[in-house]
Structure formats: structure tokens, C-alpha cells
């Protein structure tokens, strides 16, 4: 490592470093950049013969040897080596600072680790000694409890105080030492920052000096290279000029000799030509005819041979390229297959180890997944409750958005109708009638009938029966609500009244005291509302299920009781009354299970019993109301837990007519009327163009009239001037001025 310093110490030895020969990069070097450069040179040397072969050159056909190289080439090589050495030395000089800083930081870290280790050992020893002293002090407190003499207790307290003071003094001393060490570290940190700033400044100075030296050296070498090229150019010009003069003298001598020989030959040739011309003319005619025929035949054959040659040449070139390509592909495929086989062997070994691990992992995951499955089932039930809650919120938001969009669309339709009315009445002069479409009267989502609650159904039923109670006759058939299984309104009312009378324990005592001064229908309505909330009956479907369950339960009990004797029936009723009064838990549980099973069979058999006539509510005994309610609540709880998704699906609205409704809103103006609007718009545009043209013409006409009046005034002023009377031919005799 070179110590940090300026470039002044390097300048005397710079030429010596540049004059040394640079060794070729080696593949086995420790420097990664040198190894990369060596690989690149090796690849370039391997590709050079192929390039020369493709260009028609040969390695053994070099025209110049190393001795015959030009001065410019030698100068370029020397400049390249010198600049490379300069860059290498400059880079080493700049990086010496970083190396020195790295080594200094390594030494600092080693010293810091040693100091930290000594500090930890010192703290551990201090903890042990202080703990021993503290244990000694605490043990003496136990001894002091056994002493009864005040003087001994006083001496013991003094010694304990001395020991405690010594312990605190040791702790304070340790704290002061650590604080002093912290202060020295802060000072050292400030010194390090200053040292780093000095190193950075030194690095910048060296970099600037290196840039200046490199720029200076580059300029000098560029000047030397240009000078070498100029000297070589002058030498080439002088040598070529001498060669050209010698060649020109030889050429002139040869031309003179050729001219004398030619003159002699011309005389001989003229004599021979005269003799030969006559004989050649005759022979020429015969040979010409024959040769023309041969030439035509040979030209045809030549064209055929050329076509065959061109075709064969293209085939051979194509086959050669295909063979080369296949050879390269085969070598690549072989190497790929070898690598693939090795990789697959490694993958096979890894898969075997993974297979053994995954068997254990899957066994553990199976146990964890069973626990997760149970947990997810509970979460799924909670999610179903949340889905029902958010479904109601989404329905409310959907209705609000629907009403907002519907109001906006209807405002646009009203504006369109106003425009149509103005067009018909003002522009066309035709009577206009407002269209009456079915979708203009719609408000809110289509086919969305909100389900009524059980309390609303009961309220409507009580009001309906109160109004029609006087009009009904005994001989007339019962009126029916829109209930399943064609249950009459009167039957439903009787069942609900019976339920209200027998289920008073489900109502709070405070509510019962508040219901006393109310009317009968209002009292029944509030009592049934409290009972429904206690039983979990919320919707219209739950109310219908309750009524049907009462009727079917009674029908099932009647069919089973026909097979039992009257005496056993009386004893069973007495036993049931005693059991209900005693509250036997065992028999009540068995009875509940039987009734739940009956309720399930009744629910499953609803579709088969649609055509059966419901029994009369007067056959239901008041003592059976509680049993029926208990069985109904247990049967209602199970379907709600297991069939929550179908219930959400059932409450979903039918959106099949939404697109038809919104499409109808867009077609309130038919295409024929839109065509009428387009034609009227075109006509009004033409009318507007005519009006604008007329306005322009009126402006031009007014301007022309103004100019005309001005010209007439000037002419009149000219004619009325006194100078006209002095003229021999006054203008009034030539011009005939019109009078206003």
C-alpha cells in the first residue's frame, strides 16, 4: 500500500513506468478485469481466422512483416501502450487512498471489538462482585433480626451503611469510567470525520491531477501520431513521384518504337489486305450464314446451361448451409442433453428427500387442517350472518341509487318532451299530446316487493277482520288470505289468539301492566309482537310456517290418537298434565325429541300435503300449545342454521326486467320522431344560413347607400362651384345630374 500523497512524487518515475512493457492479460490472474480481458482476446483470436476465410484472406498471406510495418503503426502502438500504462498507474494512485482507508477501518473495528470484549468482561466481573456484596449485606440483615442488644444493632447498622456506601461508590466509579469512555469515543468520532474530509480532498486533488496528466499525454501522443502520419505521407509522395517519372520515360520510348514498327506493318498489311479482301468476301458470306445458325443454337444451349448451373449452385449452397446448421444444432443438443441428465439426477435426489419430508409434513398438516376445518365452519356461520346483514344494507343502497338514476332519467325525459312540444307547437304548428308509457309511472326497482314482517301481517289481519266482521254471514264460506295451503284468515286469527292467551309467560310483567288500558286489538297486537320477538319469528314466511305447523301437528296427533282407546287417552292426558306440573326433565326431553322428529317429518312432507284440507283450530287443546311451540322452535332453529344461504338466495330480487326498463327509458323518443328532428335541424340550419346572408347583404346595401349619398354631395358641390361658370364648356352641359 502506497502512503497517501500528491502526484509530485510520481512525476520523476512516470517515464520509467511508461517505458516498461505491459504483459499480456492472463486467465489465471487474481484481477477479475484482467481475466475478462484475457477471455475476450482468446475469443477474438479464435474468430479471426473465420473472418479472414469469409473475406478471402489467408493467415499465411500477410503482405507486411513486423520489420516492414509503417512508422504510423509503430507510433500508434507506442502511444497505446504509453496511455494504457498511464491510466493503470493513475488508477492505482487514486485507489491507494481507498485501500488505506479500508485498512484503517479494519484496524479500528478490531480494536473496537477488543475494547468491547474487555468492557463486557469488566461489567460481568462488576456484576458478580456487586451481587456478592449485596448477598453479604442481605445475609447480615437476617442476623440483625436475631440480635436484641441496641449497641450491637447500632454497630451492625453502621457496618451495613459502610458496605452499602462502598457498593454505591463502586457503581458510581464504573458509571464515571463509562461516561469518560463515551466522551473519548465522541472525540474520536470528530477526528475520524475530519480525517475522512481530508482524505476526500486528497482524492479529489489526485483525480484532478490525473485528469490533467491524461489530457496532456493524450494531446502529446495525438500530435506525435499526426506527425508520424504526415512524415509517412511526404515519403510516400516522393517515392511515388519518382516511380511515376521513370514509368513515363519508359512509356514514351516504347510508344516511339511501336510507332515505327506499326508504319512498316501497315504497308505490308495493305498489300495483303487487297489480296485477301476478294477471297474473304466470298468466304465471309458462306461462313456468316453458317455461323449465325451455330450462334443461335449455342446461345440457346448457353442459356440452358446457365439456368442449370444457377439452379445447381443454389441447391449446393442451400444444402451446405443446412448441413452446417444441423451440425451446430447437433452439438448444442448434445451438450444440452448432458446438462439436462445431470440436472435431472439432482432433481430426482431432491425429490426423494422432499417426498420423505412431505409425508411427515402432510400428516402434521392433516391434523392442523382438521382443527382449521372446525374453526372455519364456525367462521362460515358467522359470515352467513354478516352476509344477511350486508345484503339488507346493499338492497337499501341499491334502491337509493336506483331512485337517483331514475329521477335523473325522468328529468331528461321531461326536457325531451318539452323540446318535442316546442317543436310541434311553435315550429311545425301541430297539436302535441304527451305520451303515456308504463315505465314513466314506475318508482323504485322493478319486481321488488319488500317482505312484510310478522307484526305487519297480524296488524293487517286484525284490521281486516274488524271491518268485515259485521258483513260476514254464517252460511258464507270463510275468506282466505294469501297464505300457503289456503289457510283462511279466521283460522289464522284463532290460532294467534290461542297462542297469545297461552304464551303470556314470554311477555315481561312491565309490558303486561302497560297493555291493560289499551283496546283489545292493540293489546293483542303488542302481545303477539313480544311473543314473536321471543320465539325468533321475524318475517312473513316464519308466521306462515307457525300457522301451518299448528294445523299439521294437530292433524298428526288426531291420526295417531284414533288407534288408542278412550281410557288410555284419558290416562295419558292426566299423566301429561301431572308431568307438566312436576316439570320432569327426562320425560320432557324425550317428548321434545319426538316432537322435533315429527316437526321434521312435517316440514319434509309439505309438498306432499299441499292438497290436503287443514283441520279446524278448535280441535287444538290449550295444553298442547306449549308442546307445539317447543317443537316448532327446535325445528325452526335447525333449518335456519343449515339453510342460511338458500334464505339469502330467496330474498334476492329478480333483475330480469331491469335492462328492459332502462332500455325503454332510452326509447321514449322514437326513431321516426328523431328523423323528424334531424330534418327540422337541417332545415333550420339552412334557414339560419339564408338569414345570415341576408344580414350581410343588408349591411353591404346600407354601406353602398351611404357612399352614394357622399358621392352625390361631392358632385353637387363640384357643380355648384364658381369656377365652372368661367369654363368654355361647363360640366353642367355635359353631365346630367339627377335631382333628389
From Swiss-Prot:
List the InterPro entries. Answer: DRC1/2_N (IPR039505), DRC1/DRC2 (IPR039750), DRC1_C (IPR029440)
- Which Pfam families does the annotation name? NYD-SP28 (PF14772), NYD-SP28_assoc (PF14775)
How does this chain assemble? Component of the nexin-dynein regulatory complex (N-DRC). Interacts with CCDC65/DRC2, DRC3, GAS8/DRC4 and TCTE1/DRC5.
Q: Which gene encodes it?
A: DRC1
Name the family the entry cites: Belongs to the DRC1 family.
Which keywords annotate this record?
Cell projection, Cilium, Coiled coil, Cytoplasm, Cytoskeleton, Flagellum
Q: Which positions make up the signal peptide?
A: none
What job does this protein perform? Component of the nexin-dynein regulatory complex (N-DRC) a key regulator of ciliary/flagellar motility which maintains the alignment and integrity of the distal axoneme and regulates microtubule sliding in motile axonemes. Plays a critical role in the assembly of N-DRC and also stabilizes the assembly of multiple inner dynein arms and radial spokes. Coassembles with CCDC65/DRC2 to form a central scaffold needed for assembly of the N-DRC and its attachment to the outer doublet microtubules.
Name used for this protein in its record:
Dynein regulatory complex protein 1
Principal cellular location given in the protein's record? cytoplasm
Residue runs in coiled coils? 101-387, 691-724
Q: Which organism is it from?
A: Macaca fascicularis
Q: Could you tell me where this protein is found in the cell?
A: Cytoplasm, Cytoskeleton, Cilium axoneme; Cytoplasm, Cytoskeleton, Flagellum axoneme
The processes (GO biological process) annotated in the record are: axonemal dynein complex assembly; cilium-dependent cell motility; regulation of cilium movement
Give me the ranges of the annotated region Disordered: 56-75, 573-620
Q: Where are the compositionally biased (Basic and acidic residues) regions?
A: 595-605
GO cellular component terms, semicolon-separated: axonemal dynein complex; axoneme; motile cilium
Amino acid at each position: 500500500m502506497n502512503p497517501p500523497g500528491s502526484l509530485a512524487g510520481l512525476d520523476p518515475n512516470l517515464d520509467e513506468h511508461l517505458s516498461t512493457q505491459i504483459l499480456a492479460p492472463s486467465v489465471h490472474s487474481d484481477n477479475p478485469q484482467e481475466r475478462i480481458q484475457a477471455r475476450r482476446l482468446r475469443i477474438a483470436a479464435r474468430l479471426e481466422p473465420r473472418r479472414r476465410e469469409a473475406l478471402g484472406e489467408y493467415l499465411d498471406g500477410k503482405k507486411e512483416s513486423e520489420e516492414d510495418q509503417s512508422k504510423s503503426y509503430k507510433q500508434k502502438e507506442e502511444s497505446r501502450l504509453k496511455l494504457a500504462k498511464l491510466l493503470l498507474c493513475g488508477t492505482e494512485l487514486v485507489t491507494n487512498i481507498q485501500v488505506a482507508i479500508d485498512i484503517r477501518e479494519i484496524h479500528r473495528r478490531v480494536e473496537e471489538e477488543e475494547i468491547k470484549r474487555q468492557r463486557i468482561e469488566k461489567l460481568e466481573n462488576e456484576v458478580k462482585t456487586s451481587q456478592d456484596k449485596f448477598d453479604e449485606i442481605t445475609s447480615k440483615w437476617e442476623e440483625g433480626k436475631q440480635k436484641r442488644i441496641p449497641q450491637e444493632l447500632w454497630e451492625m447498622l453502621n457496618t451495613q451503611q459502610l458496605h452499602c456506601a462502598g457498593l454505591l461508590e463502586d457503581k458510581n466509579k464504573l458509571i464515571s469510567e463509562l461516561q469518560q469512555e463515551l466522551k473519548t469515543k465522541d472525540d474520536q468520532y470528530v477526528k475520524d470525520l475530519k480525517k475522512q474530509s481530508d482524505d476526500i480532498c486528497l482524492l479529489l486533488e489526485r483525480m484532478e491531477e490525473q485528469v490533467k496528466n491524461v489530457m496532456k499525454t493524450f494531446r502529446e501522443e495525438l500530435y506525435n501520431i499526426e506527425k508520424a502520419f504526415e512524415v509517412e505521407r511526404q515519403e510516400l509522395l516522393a517515392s511515388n513521384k519518382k516511380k511515376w517519372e521513370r514509368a513515363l520515360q519508359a512509356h514514351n520510348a516504347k510508344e516511339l518504337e511501336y510507332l515505327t514498327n506499326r508504319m512498316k506493318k501497315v504497308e505490308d498489311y495493305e498489300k495483303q489486305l487487297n489480296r485477301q479482301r476478294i477471297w474473304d468476301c466470298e468466304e465471309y458470306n458462306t461462313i456468316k450464314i453458317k455461323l449465325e445458325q451455330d450462334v443461335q443454337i449455342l446461345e440457346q444451349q448457353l442459356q440452358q446451361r446457365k439456368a442449370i448451373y444457377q439452379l445447381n449452385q443454389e441447391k449446393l449452397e442451400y444444402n451446405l448451409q443446412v448441413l452446417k446448421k444441423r451440425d451446430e444444432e447437433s452439438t448444442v443438443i448434445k451438450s444440452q442433453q448432458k446438462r439436462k441428465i445431470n440436472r435431472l439426477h439432482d432433481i430426482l435426489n431432491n425429490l426423494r428427500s422432499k417426498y420423505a419430508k412431505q409425508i411427515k409434513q402432510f400428516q402434521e398438516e392433516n391434523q392442523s387442517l382438521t382443527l382449521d376445518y372446525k374453526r372455519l365452519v364456525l367462521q362460515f356461520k358467522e359470515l352467513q350472518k354478516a352476509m344477511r346483514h350486508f345484503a339488507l344494507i346493499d338492497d337499501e343502497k341499491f334502491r337509493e341509487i336506483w331512485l337517483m338514476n331514475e329521477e335523473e332519467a325522468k328529468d331528461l325525459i321531461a326536457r325531451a318532451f318539452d323540446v318535442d312540444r316546442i317543436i310541434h307547437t311553435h315550429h311545425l304548428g301541430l297539436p302535441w299530446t304527451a305520451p303515456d308509457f308504463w315505465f314513466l309511472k314506475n318508482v323504485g326497482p322493478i319486481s321488488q316487493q319488500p317482505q312484510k314482517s310478522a307484526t305487519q301481517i297480524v296488524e293487517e289481519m286484525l284490521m281486516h277482520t274488524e271491518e268485515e266482521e259485521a258483513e260476514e254471514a254464517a252460511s258464507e264460506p270463510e275468506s282466505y288470505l294469501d297464505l300457503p295451503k289456503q289457510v283462511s284468515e279466521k283460522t289464522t286469527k284463532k290460532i294467534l289468539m290461542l297462542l297469545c292467551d297461552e304464551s303470556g309467560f314470554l311477555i315481561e310483567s312491565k309490558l303486561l301492566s302497560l297493555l291493560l288500558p289499551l283496546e283489545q286489538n292493540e293489546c293483542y297486537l303488542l302481545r303477539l309482537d313480544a311473543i314473536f320477538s321471543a320465539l325468533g319469528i321475524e318475517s312473513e314466511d316464519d308466521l306462515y310456517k307457525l300457522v301451518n305447523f299448528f294445523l299439521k301437528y294437530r292433524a298428526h296427533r288426531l291420526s295417531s290418537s284414533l288407534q288408542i282407546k278412550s281410557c288410555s287417552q284419558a290416562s295419558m292426558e292426566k299423566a301429561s298434565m301431572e308431568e307438566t306440573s312436576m316439570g320432569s326433565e327426562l320425560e320432557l326431553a324425550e317428548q321434545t325429541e319426538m316432537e322435533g322428529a315429527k316437526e321434521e317429518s312435517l316440514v319434509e312432507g309439505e309438498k306432499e300435503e299441499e292438497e290436503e284440507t287443514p283441520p279446524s283450530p278448535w280441535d287444538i287443546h290449550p295444553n298442547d300449545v306449549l308442546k307445539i311451540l317447543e317443537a316448532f322452535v327446535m325445528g325452526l332453529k335447525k333449518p335456519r342454521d343449515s339453510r342460511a344461504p338458500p334464505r339469502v338466495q330467496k330474498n334476492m330480487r329478480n333483475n330480469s326486467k331491469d335492462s328492459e326498463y332502462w332500455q325503454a327509458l332510452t326509447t321514449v323518443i322514437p326513431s321516426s320522431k328523431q328523423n323528424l328532428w334531424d330534418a327540422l335541424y337541417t332545415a333550420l340550419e339552412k334557414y339560419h344560413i339564408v338569414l345570415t346572408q341576408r344580414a350581410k347583404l343588408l349591411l353591404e346595401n346600407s354601406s353602398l347607400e351611404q357612399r352614394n349619398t357622399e358621392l352625390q354631395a361631392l358632385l353637387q358641390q363640384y357643380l355648384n362651384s364658381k369656377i365652372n361658370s368661367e369654363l368654355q364648356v361647363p360640366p353642367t352641359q355635359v353631365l346630367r345630374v339627377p335631382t333628389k
